[in-house]
Amino acid sequence: MRAVHFGAGNIGRGFIGSLLAASGYDVVFVDVNEQIVRLLKERGEYRVIIAGERQEEQWVRGVSALNSQTERDDVIEAIASADLVTTAVGPHILPVIAPVIAAGLERRFTVHQKPLHVIACENMIGGTETLKQHVVTHLSEAGRQLVEECVGFLNCAVDRIVPNQTNDDPLAVTVEPFFEWAIETKNTIGAVPPIQGAHFVADLGPYIERKLFTVNTGHALAAYLGYQKQYRTVQEAMKDSGIRESVEQALRESGAVLVKKHGWDEQEHRSYIETTIGRFTNPSLSDDIVRVARSPIRKLGPNDRLVAPAVQYYTLFERVPSGLVKGIAALLLFDETGDAEATALQQTIEQSGVEGALVQYAGLDNSHPLVVAVKEEYKKMQKEQ
């Protein structure tokens, strides 16, 4: 079996590529990083370090690589003969790789029409559907018809902490032990692709929301509260008992929303929260706070990790969620000068106040009780700075 994987970065090598290789695929990485592509070609293997209580090493073998800029024709041929195509490139790169994927599919259809699955493993909702929309704009009319018949674009949710890192060996990558790869089956063509460690689900929605309202919510709180106390990493911040309690409180609140909405077992979800807290406190990882906190305007969005669970909590329980409110207030104080969104956010607050920022970016009415609560918490945090 052959898998073509776009994105030979840390997530591509340390998560998706390693699982595909373990599942029996010959993995062809596609990237524009000349050094990484050259080393993967030369060695055909790389090392993954699992940073748990005890450090483990795994060797990923039987891999190769292509440069999508200088070896475009080879990438097209690889797609034409692939059994699976996956990506881990970042949402903004999906439209960039769409033309070569489309060309590969057109070439494939001239040779055979065997089923193919495409899975975009991106930190976004509906990533594969988004990729499909970009791909079809580059297909012929006949190609579009054959895509509907022969290619299954499967949405997925992925979760593994792969921190920023610098290794002596450019191919080596450190990852946390935990991972989750949930793949939605509704667009499957024939049998689901064999992927060791992935689980296939009929409805991805609850899995995406569970991750967003737990992992992303908790991560954001630790980062924004940690930034206020000038901690460098999430792991350092989580050693602060006050920050840890605030994170746990917020996850109890978002957890109450999830349990109520989806009818989940409360104890099972509590266990998931405990696992998540354990991931944030893993001493073998170093999660840079500024990296986790970046893009605060996006993270303040009405459907994102802080405002969405806070609004739903208030709607369901008619109480203000104090932990989530703390997280939103801390986000509004994030003023990292190297972050364009942080700069824009601070300018909005200066011009329109906290209420103006929450109306503009979070989609809240300025009379909403959450706005009042966040404003109070914001003032309190300002005094403590």
UniProtKB/Swiss-Prot annotation:
Its EC number is 1.1.1.17. It catalyses: D-mannitol 1-phosphate + NAD(+) = beta-D-fructose 6-phosphate + NADH + H(+). InterPro entries: 6-PGluconate_DH-like_C_sf, 6PGD_dom2, Mannitol_1_phos_5_DH, Mannitol_DH, Mannitol_DH_C, Mannitol_DH_CS, Mannitol_DH_N, NAD(P)-bd_dom_sf. GO terms for biological process: mannitol catabolic process. NAD(+) binds at residues 3-14. It is an enzyme of class 1 (oxidoreductase). GO terms for cellular component: cytosol. The keyword Amino-acid biosynthesis does not apply. Keywords: NAD, Oxidoreductase. One of its GO terms (molecular function) is mannitol-1-phosphate 5-dehydrogenase activity. It comes from the Bacteria. Belongs to the mannitol dehydrogenase family. This is Mannitol-1-phosphate 5-dehydrogenase. It comes from Geobacillus thermodenitrificans (strain NG80-2).
